Amino acid sequence: MLWPALRSVLFQLDPERVHHLAHWALHRVPPALARARRPAPVPALAVRCMGLDFDGPMGLAAGFDKGDVALPGLFGLGFSHVEIGTITPRPQPGNDRPRLFRLPEHRALLNRMGFNNEGMEACARRLAALPAAARLGPVGINVGKNKATPNEDAASDYLACIERLHPYADYLVVNISSPNTPGLRQLQEREALDRLLRACVRHLAERAPGKPLLVKLAPDLSPEALDEAVDVAIAAGAAGIVATNTTLSRAGVERHPRAAEAGGLSGAPLERLATEVVRRCYARAAGRVPIVGVGGVMDAEGAYAKIRAGATLVQAYTGLIYGGPGFVGRVNAGLARLLERDGFSTLSDAVGADHRQGGGKAAG
């Protein structure tokens, strides 16, 4: 009950200032304390995916830790995996402030951060200095291109990040779907996507055979474009699909004073759209690669909806902002109850249940 009171105080402050305060605190959590305070894993929620073991489905989405590497503190919150990034080859400040806005009435955030980060060298140094005990689960690294790099040269940026960062990642994600870097989403088009992913997959395979490389897609693609992107990604050798990024849609928040701000919307208003994208990606992939469901996961029911729609793993960011330090523990406890309610002995049994006749009781 303490979190709602603390949140009301923090929400009086600038969102980026609060973000930096949170990182400051998380950085100071020693690995031993993180391990001791971490919520106990629920055996039924364990997942093996892409050759990696996850003690539950709930991970931290890219965007929260942009290379500051506060891994012990983040794993201490209960996340099964943490995705760092987006990281670019060269440091860049991102877009002008203000660039992060809360929409508390809608449990949402609106951001136009623009891949602000200190670059791949700083990220690599921090990860190299991290003790092995700080890694309490798989660590992903989400990579992107610098704003100044034209799309025709984008592959060089992604390859540079893969080259420098792959030794520190359990998996990598090619981010071509942020709405806050001009022209970036054009890389989701068939020919550009095929060229980029084939180059990235080949480069990683030569340096770390078997290490998974995924691609993160936007929720705003047409159904036909989404099907095409999934087909191209799988044909190019991607190990999975991350669905989805933030949306340009303002459905559900049209009347909010911040609705006219540029940027991507995340949180509860994105939940239904993102789940439908997961559903379509799962159907199109037809078991060839796993789907990581992201977007509007604010509670156990939202996470479960994505799992039943086809997500093997689920990630959250905005849900943590609104749900506080106990967020992951509550989601995992709720997922265990929902699995039991629907007669599933393991989480893996529930993945894609909505696509199967007799796949357990109806969600909700």
UniProtKB/Swiss-Prot annotation:
FMN binds at residues 62-66, 86, 142, 175, 216, 244, 267, 296, 317-318. Its EC number is 1.3.5.2. PROSITE patterns: DHODEHASE_1, DHODEHASE_2. It is an enzyme of class 1 (oxidoreductase). Substrate binds at residues 66, 111-115, 175, 180, 245-246. Keywords: Cell membrane, Flavoprotein, FMN, Membrane, Oxidoreductase, Pyrimidine biosynthesis. It is a peripheral membrane protein. This is Dihydroorotate dehydrogenase (quinone).
